[in-house]
Structures are given as structure tokens and as C-alpha cells.
UniProtKB/Swiss-Prot annotation:
This is Testis-specific zinc finger protein topi. Gene3D superfamilies: Classic Zinc Finger. Required for male meiotic division and spermatid differentiation. Required for accumulation of aly and comr on chromatin. May function as a transcription factor. It comes from Drosophila melanogaster (Fruit fly). Residues 669-705 are annotated as: Disordered. The gene is topi.
Length: 814
């Protein structure tokens, strides 16, 4: 190889044999190919592969690049690549001819190897070169190559090429590495970006997805994936269901961003110093990005100052946008630096520094702001007609919610693309408040009504917020009206249909209790229920001095918390109340949820609990099953009776309470006899059957006709109820009182084992107590001090002494 310096160029003349073919790999690093132009006779630099193929032979078959026509055809046939090209242009339509020319121009400047500052655009991987050639270093001053050891000991005394060449010829100097040549008029030379000083993004694998050297598709989707491995990322799952749930997160990732600007990386949470543009309000984490953004405002002001006649069309702006898309390196081009000097840098007054902990991001692009007013002004600049567009079917939508619904439910092409990934994407409906998923819209609307997840909307005038019903075209102003409408018109119907669906063969209660008729779905539940009938209590409390036993373990746990530990483990997160048992806590939660499951068939009123509905139904039936123990008043609820006893009878001692009970018994007996006298047919039937009311003492439990509670209540007059007061024993006729109630005590035929209750007056001696009998008043006392009736010798009288410290009745009524 001979090297000579001729005129204004440094040329490398390579001598080859006739049968030898020269490839581009035989060139040295940094070499520039010059060819003679036949028309002008001058030298011209070769920059494309097509022009280079006229002088050099094509490489071996294994290293053949993919033909340009094939790459262009595959690129235009792929919808994803079409979308990328369309976004890069920023135009609404798609021109295949123009895009084809752009792809060809781009491929003309891209090689199969990665472009760096040390390699030329035409220098590929030299597979036939030796290791010594690859590791050799060329001196930039004398252009002599050395190995690594010799280059360290090399001391160059030659003058640099820039000094050897005259100054007037310096712009025409052919550089080796540092100084790029003057730009040509061809678009391909501009896309090379001034001789490798800027490294573009690798379109070979990232965007074009084809390896130009081998023609093998290098998409990561075709890589070997496991049976439960995500095709979008490297996540692996044990079960297919986990993969399906994971792929739902990638659903919206298939829709490319509608903004051509690459999203910047926001730092982690915390306080950060940001730069704010005072012109538009945008904030930046990187000062360099803010500086480039300020040039846009300067160009806008300069454009407004220029007249339309003085504006010169140039492709330099498009070229700068291409630089922003790539990763820029250090630029040493003198011509480019001179052109940048004419552009005034943005003033410092255009920016201000802030310390922020949170930012506001536009929902339509990646811009971030610090002030809500500036964000609203920016959001209004987005055109509503083209905010979101489906890349598969070219349908345009206004909001992200519409785009998401279209992608998940309506777009057939997108579902086909997902199905090609062999992943089943479940169709679901999500609540925007709690992010719960539902299988259909009916369940979603039912959840919104019961959980108060309402979404008010403005009316046509834009002055009021209304609650629209999703099932019908009715709007409501208040939430309680909307809830009542949903429960009455829609939710009840849905629940009845759901109950009808749940009565299938799989939900039949086939385990029936022979004693009470209750049925269960599982045999274990029936076994636990039978313990109540059999009286089996296997669970014993282990606390000291406590031998309580229980049928089921939950009752034992409730007993321990209530009587020993006092623990209330069930906490309501809404109001903060705590509960002992889970059943009470569950009923309490229904209040916050607003779930009134139990409805009255008479009036339609709904309740949270079944016992509340049962108490309410007694209003319609008139039933009052809870009667006072000391008077004739009756109540519908047990709590009302207990309140009455604490208010009216808590001051009574043991004897007074017993007297009140006897007075109540007398009035009830009189009412029963009165009711029987008004029913002669029933009395005749009793006589015909061999039964007589005289055979059984009145008021006993052996009467054939027993009046109901309501009859006894109406038979006793209010005057009689007012007369039922506690009177001391000294103020009543003891002979009449004792004789009357001793006759009313039921006795067996032999009279054995029966007792007659008598009283000891407080402060009176036992020997001084007089006991009267109805038939024989003056019968003397026996020696034992216990009187006996003449016809019933074994009937004893039990003397009950008053002990105020131990009341007869439970303290619950006090």
C-alpha cells in the first residue's frame, strides 16, 4: 500500500491483484473513501452503501445485509411500525410513498454495527482480521499504528496535520477522527449526524426489530419463554392464573403514548430543587432540559418579530429534533458551533428555582407543573378531538377512560393481538373508588349503591350536581333519594334473581334435623346442631372457679372474653367501636354499609337485622309476649319490659315482690273465669267431656280453656292495674289473703310433696305468727309448728323468711 500527499487531499492508494476482491472491512479505521465524479471531474466523498458497492465487492453470503426493499416492505406492513412513523411525523394521515423514502434514506446511513466515535460508519466487524490488528492504536499526529506497549513509549515529533496544511485550506481538510467533513446536500448524510459525533438510538433492535446483518428477527417476544412466563417482561409464575392477573397490568401498555416527546424520569419521593419556566409554568428536574426548553420560547419570539418574507425555509429545525431524540455526545464541529453563537441563550429571568415535594402532571401528556392554574391552562391546549387514538382500528376517543373501555371490550383487533400471546385477558369492571373488580355492570352498580360510591355529574346548565341512575334515565339531587330509588326499583329485583339462581342442586340443604326441622348443607354443621338437643357440652372453661360448659367452641371464646379477659378484638374501622363477638360486629357493619337486608311484608320497611324485623312485625300482629313479673303489663320487646321493672318495681323488697305476683295471679285468674263465662259452648263441651271447672281450682294450669295474653290484658281494667300497689302485710286481711291463695295451689291426688307458701312478717316471732285456713279458721297449731290440712295430712307449709341481702329475683330486673 502506497501513501502519498497530493495537493489538498491525503489519499490512500491500495494496490490489489486482478482476481482479488476488496471489501469495506479492508479499510483502516477513520478512512474516508473519495471517488472521481465523471461529470465534474472532481473528487467526491462516498457516504452510502449503494455508492460504495460500485468500487468494492460485497461480503460473503453469511454476512449479507437484508435487502433494503425487504426491510421497507416489512416495516410498512407492520401496524406498530406504521404507528411509530406516524407519531414521529406528527401528521394525521399516513403517506406510504413519503415514509418509504424516509426509511430508505435512513437505511442508507445505518450499518449493522453500533456507531461509535472510534469507528467509521462504513467500518464493520472484521471477522478475518487478526488479534494484533484489532488491538493496534494509531497516533493521531503521525498516523502510524502501534500496539499498546509501543504506543506508550512513542514520542511523536511530527507536526500535526492541521499545522502542515495551510490555514486557507483547513476547511477542506479530510479529517480522520475528530473533525467531520462539511455536510453534503443529501439527507442521508445529515442522518449520519456529522460523521459519528452523535450516536442515535439503535433502530436495529429497539424500533426496526430486525438485524440488518443477518435478517433474523430479534424481537424479544420470540425468545424462548416458559409456559407461565410473561411475554412482556421477565416475570415468571407458578400457576397460569397468576400470569393472567399479571398480564392485565400490561393491557394498557400495548397502546403507545400519543406524545412524541420521551417521558422524563421523575426522581423518588421527597423534596427536590426544580427549575420552573416563567413563561409556560412547566417545571424540570434537569437544568439542561430546561435550557433547551427556553430556546423554544426564544425562537417563538424571534419568529413573531420576523416578517414572513424574511423567513428562509431550512431543514435545520427538523435536524435538531432528530438530535433531541438520540443521545447527544460532545460536539466539536466549528461550523455548528459558529451557527449556535448566533442564537442568543435564554435569559436567566425566564427561569426560577423551586423546592417541591409533589408535582402536578397533565393527564394527556408528560408535562409537569407546580401550580394548578398553569396546569389547567395547559390542559385546555390539548385538542379534544384527538387525545386518544386506538392503534389497531384508528378510532379516536376523548378521555383515557373511554380508551381503556374500548381496548378491553370493543376493539376486536386488540383482542386478537392479545390472543396471539396465548394469554387470556379476563373482562371485568372496576370501581373507580375502591378498585374492586366485578364480572358485570349489574354487580358493579349494586356495589356502588350499597357502598355509597356515587359519581355526581353536572346538569345541563352546569350549576347543580346530580346523581344519575345507571339503570334508568332518572337523576337525583340527594343521596338518600337515590339510595331509596336503587333499593326499591333495582337492587331488590337483582337480589331476588340472585336468590333464585342460588337455589340450584349444589345448594340444597340435604342434612335435616329430625327434632326441630332445621336443614344444613354440611353434615358437620348438623352434628354441631344436634349437641344443643342432646345437651352435650364438651367445651369447658379452664379459668379458676369457673366450670361453665358450652356446646360449641365459639360460645366458649365469647364467654372467656366477656367474663374473664374483657377483650374486644373486633374493631370497626369506621366509627372505632369494639365488639366482643363476631356476630355483633357483623351486624354493626351492616349499619355503615347501609345494607337493610330484611324487609317487612306488610309495610315494606327494611331493617339491618332479623331480630329487628321480628320485633317490628309484632306491631302488625299486636303480639306482646313479654309480660311484667309483678303486674299485668305486657311488652313487645324484652328490653322494654326490663326498663319497666327497673323503673316501677326496683324499690320492692322480697315480700313485696311476692305479694305483687300474687295480686297479678288473682287478677289473671278472674279474667280467665270471666272469659270462660262468656263462652258457654266451650263450657258445655268441657262438661260433656267429663271435666268441670269445679274439679280443678281456678287459676291453676289444669284448666281446659286457657285465655291468651291479649284476652287477659283486655279483661283487666285500668282501674284494677292502678290498684296493684305494694301494701305492707299488716294493712291487709291476712285471713282472706292466705285462705284464698292457699286454695289456688294445685295439689296431687295423694297430696304428697305439695307445699303451701306462708309468710313471716318482718320483726314478728315465728311462734306468734297466726296461720289461717279457709275451711277451719280456728284449727290449732301442731307441735311441730307447721300446720296441716285435715284432708291432706302430708301437705306441709313452707315458711319463707325475709332476707334482704338475698333477693328472690335476679338483679337484671333491678
Amino acid at each position: 500500500m502506497k501513501v502519498k500527499v497530493s495537493g489538498e487531499y491525503t489519499l490512500a492508494e491500495i494496490e490489489v491483484e486482478l482476481d482479488q476482491q476488496l471489501t469495506p472491512d479492508d479499510l483502516q479505521p477513520g478512512a474516508t473513501v473519495l471517488a472521481t465524479n465523471e461529470s465534474t471531474g472532481g473528487l467526491e466523498r462516498i457516504v452510502s452503501h449503494e455508492e460504495l458497492s460500485r468500487f468494492f465487492a460485497v461480503g460473503p453470503a453469511g454476512a449479507l445485509p437484508m435487502p433494503t426493499d425487504v426491510v421497507v416492505e416489512r416495516t410498512l406492513a407492520d401496524p406498530a411500525f406504521k404507528q411509530i412513523l406516524q407519531e414521529a411525523d406528527g401528521k394525521k394521515g399516513f403517506d406510504p410513498q413519503a415514509e418509504q423514502m424516509k426509511i430508505r434514506d435512513f437505511l442508507a446511513g445505518v450499518t449493522s454495527s453500533k456507531m461509535t466515535t472510534e469507528q467509521s460508519v462504513f467500518h464493520g466487524s472484521r471477522s478475518n482480521s487478526s488479534a494484533s490488528t484489532v488491538n493496534r492504536i494509531k497516533c493521531p499526529t503521525c498516523l502510524v499504528q502501534f500496539d499498546a506497549v509501543a504506543f506508550q513509549n512513542h514520542s511523536c515529533e511530527a507536526k500535526p496535520i492541521e499545522v502542515a496544511v495551510p490555514q486557507q485550506e483547513k476547511p477542506h481538510l479530510v479529517p480522520t477522527v475528530s473533525a467531520p467533513p462539511a455536510p453534503l446536500s443529501k439527507p442521508a448524510s445529515e442522518r449520519v449526524i456529522r460523521e459519528n459525533q452523535v450516536r442515535l438510538r439503535r433502530y436495529i433492535k429497539d424500533e426496526m426489530k430486525y438485524d440488518l446483518a443477518t435478517g433474523i428477527e430479534s424481537s424479544r417476544k420470540n425468545a424462548a419463554k416458559g409456559p407461565n412466563e410473561c411475554t412482556m417482561c421477565d416475570r415468571k409464575f407458578v400457576h397460569a392464573s397468576g400470569l393472567v392477573r399479571h398480564m392485565e397490568k400490561h393491557a394498557l401498555d400495548l397502546i403507545p403514548s400519543q406524545t412524541s416527546e420521551q417521558p422524563h424520569t421523575i426522581p423518588a419521593a421527597g423534596l427536590h430543587v426544580v427549575v420552573k419556566c416563567n413563561s409556560c409554568g412547566r417545571i424540570f428536574y434537569d437544568p439542561q432540559v430546561a435550557f433547551r426548553h427556553g430556546l423554544i420560547h426564544d425562537s417563538e419570539h424571534s419568529t413573531m418579530r420576523q416578517s414572513p418574507m424574511t423567513q428562509v425555509p431550512s431543514n435545520r429545525a427538523d435536524f435538531n429534533e432528530l438530535l433531541l431524540d438520540g443521545e447527544m455526545l460532545i460536539d466539536n464541529d466549528p461550523a455548528f458551533a459558529t451557527s449556535n453563537q448566533n442564537t442568543n441563550p435564554p435569559k436567566k429571568e425566564m427561569f426560577s428555582s423551586l423546592i417541591l415535594g409533589s408535582v402536578l402532571q397533565c393527564e394527556f401528556c408528560e408535562y409537569i407543573f407546580a401550580d394548578i392554574a398553569e396546569l389547567l391552562v395547559h390542559s385546555a391546549s390539548h385538542v379534544a378531538e384527538r387525545r386518544f387514538e386506538c392503534t389497531a382500528c384508528d378510532i379516536q376517543m376523548n378521555t383515557a377512560k373511554e380508551a381503556s373501555i374500548h381496548f378491553q371490550t370493543d376493539c376486536i383487533f386488540m383482542r386478537e393481538a392479545i390472543r396471539s400471546l396465548n394469554v387470556t385477558l379476563s373482562r371485568y369492571f372496576v370501581c373507580n373508588v375502591c378498585e374492586l373488580k366485578f364480572a358485570n355492570t349489574d354487580l358493579l352498580q349494586e356495589h356502588r349503591c350499597t357502598s355509597f360510591h356515587y359519581f355526581p355529574r353536572l346538569n345541563e346548565n352546569g350549576k347543580k350536581l346530580l346523581l344519575p341512575c345507571d339503570f334508568c334515565d332518572v337523576n337525583f339531587e340527594f343521596a338518600h333519594d337515590f339510595l331509596a330509588h336503587s333499593e326499591e326499583k333495582h337492587l331488590n329485583k337483582k337480589k331476588r334473581e340472585k336468590e333464585t339462581r342460588n337455589t340450584g342442586a349444589g345448594r340444597i340443604r340435604q342434612y335435616l334435623c329430625d327434632i326441630c326441622g332445621k336443614s344444613y348443607t354440611q353434615s358437620s354443621h348438623l352434628w354441631q346442631h344436634l349437641r344443643f338437643h342432646q345437651g352435650v357440652k364438651p367445651f369447658v372453661c379452664q379459668e379458676e372457679n369457673c366450670d361453665r360448659k358450652f356446646t360449641i367452641r365459639p360460645d366458649l371464646n365469647d364467654h372467656i372474653r366477656k367474663c374473664h379477659t374483657g377483650e374486644r378484638p373486633y374493631l370497626c374501622l369506621v366509627c372505632g367501636k369494639r365488639f366482643l363477638t363476631g356476630s355483633v360486629f357483623y351486624q354493626h357493619r351492616l349499619i355503615h354499609r347501609g345494607e337493610r337486608r330484611y324487609e317487612c311484608e306488610e309495610c315494606g320497611k327494611r331493617f339491618y337485622r332479623a331480630d329487628a324485623l321480628k320485633n317490628h312485625q309484632r306491631i302488625h300482629t299486636g303480639e306482646k309476649p313479654y309480660s311484667c313479673l309483678f303486674c299485668t303489663k305486657t311488652f313487645r320487646q324484652r328490653g322494654d319490659r326490663d326498663k319497666h321493672i327497673r323503673a316501677r318495681h326496683s324499690h320492692l323488697d322480697a315480700n313485696s315482690r311476692l305479694m305483687m305476683q300474687m295480686q297479678k295471679f288473682q287478677l289473671e285468674t278472674a279474667a280467665a273465669q270471666k272469659a270462660q263465662s262468656h263462652n258457654p259452648e266451650q263450657q258445655d263441651n268441657d262438661v260433656a267431656g267429663g271435666a268441670s271447672t269445679s274439679d280443678v281450682p281456678s287459676g291453676s294450669g289444669f284448666m281446659s280453656t286457657e285465655p291468651s295474653v291479649a284476652e287477659m290484658q283486655y279483661s283487666i281494667t285500668p282501674e284494677q292495674q292502678e290498684e296493684m300497689v305494694c301494701v305492707p302485710i299488716d294493712e291487709v286481711n291476712n285471713s282472706f289473703f292466705m285462705s284464698h291463695y292457699m286454695q289456688a295451689v294445685p295439689m296431687e291426688e295423694d297430696g304428697s310433696g305439695q307445699h303451701i307458701i306462708v309468710f313471716e312478717q318482718p320483726g314478728q316471732n315465728m311462734d306468734m305468727m297466726s296461720i289461717y285456713d279457709q275451711q277451719q279458721v280456728g284449727e290449732p297449731m301442731h307441735e311441730s309448728g307447721v300446720p296441716k290440712r285435715p284432708a291432706e295430712e302430708n301437705a306441709r307449709v313452707v315458711v319463707v323468711k325475709n332476707n334482704p341481702t338475698k333477693p328472690i329475683f335476679s338483679d337484671t330486673y333491678l
